[in-house]
From Swiss-Prot:
Family membership noted in the UniProt record: Belongs to the ORM family.
Role according to the record: Plays an essential role in the homeostatic regulation of sphingolipid de novo biosynthesis by modulating the activity of the serine palmitoyltransferase (SPT) in response to ceramide levels. When complexed to SPT, the binding of ceramides to its N-terminus stabilizes a conformation that block SPT substrate entry, hence preventing SPT catalytic activity. Through this mechanism, maintains ceramide levels at sufficient concentrations for the production of complex sphingolipids, but which prevents the accumulation of ceramides to levels that trigger apoptosis.
Assembly description: Ceramide-sensitive subunit of the serine palmitoyltransferase (SPT) complex, which is also composed of SPTLC1, SPTLC2/3 and SPTSSA/B.
Species in which this protein is naturally found: Bos taurus
Entry protein name: ORM1-like protein 3
Residues in the Extracellular compartment per record: 118-121
Modification note: When hydroxylated at Pro-137, ubiquitinated via 'Lys-48'-linkage, leading to proteasomal degradation. In endothelial cells, ORMDL3 proteasomal degradation is controlled by the sphingosine 1-phosphate receptor signaling pathway.
Keywords on record: Endoplasmic reticulum, Hydroxylation, Membrane, Transmembrane, Transmembrane helix, Ubl conjugation
A Pfam family annotated for this UniProt entry: ORMDL
Taxonomic lineage: Eukaryota, Metazoa, Chordata, Craniata, Vertebrata
Residue ranges annotated as Cytoplasmic topological domain: 1-21, 64-94, 143-153
Length: 153
């Protein structure tokens, strides 16, 4: 029973990234994170760029690929209970504008980070591993796949 709900979606998680202004808010949040990290004294610019990239990718991995279910009481009989937010997004349709945006954003951030760290080997390895950790779960071939049973339930 959905008394008092105002949305018409069976699962509001499916359309949240298509909301008005969400992409701009997302980019501004990344910029704000970067500015906050830049304001920490005695931290160099390459370290700040790497921290921005690592924090962004860690947050993206946790919120899109680890957390399952919905924060709402949905009438879908628990179908979304075992799906991550990435799998619920756009009803599972691949290659939508929102999915492309969320795939391209860490890549652009990776390029910026690599440039501003001057391709330092340690920063480069950390940023590459971080990028792969958020890009690989986004592949269509891994939709619904739980590697080694991790995050199965």
């Amino acid at each position: 029973m959905n008394v008092g709900t105002a949305h018409s979606e069976v699962n509001p998680n499916t359309r949240v990234m298509n909301s008005r202004g969400i992409w701009l808010s997302y980019v501004l949040a990344i910029g704000l994170l970067h500015v906050v990290l830049l304001s920490i004294p005695f931290v160099s610019v390459p370290v700040v760029w790497t921290l921005t990239n690592l924090i962004h990718n860690m947050g993206m991995y946790i919120f899109l690929h680890t957390v399952k279910g919905t924060p709402f009481e949905t009438p879908d009989q628990g179908k979304a209970r075992l799906l991550t937010h990435w799998e619920q997004m756009d009803y599972g349709v691949q290659f939508t504008a929102s999915r492309k945006f969320l795939t391209i954003t860490p890549i652009v951030l990776y390029f910026l980070t690599s440039f501003y760290t001057k391709y330092d080997q340690i920063h480069f390895i950390l940023n590459t591993v971080s990028l792969m950790s958020v890009l690989i779960p986004k592949l269509p071939q891994l939709h619904g796949v739980r590697i080694f049973g991790i995050n199965k339930y």
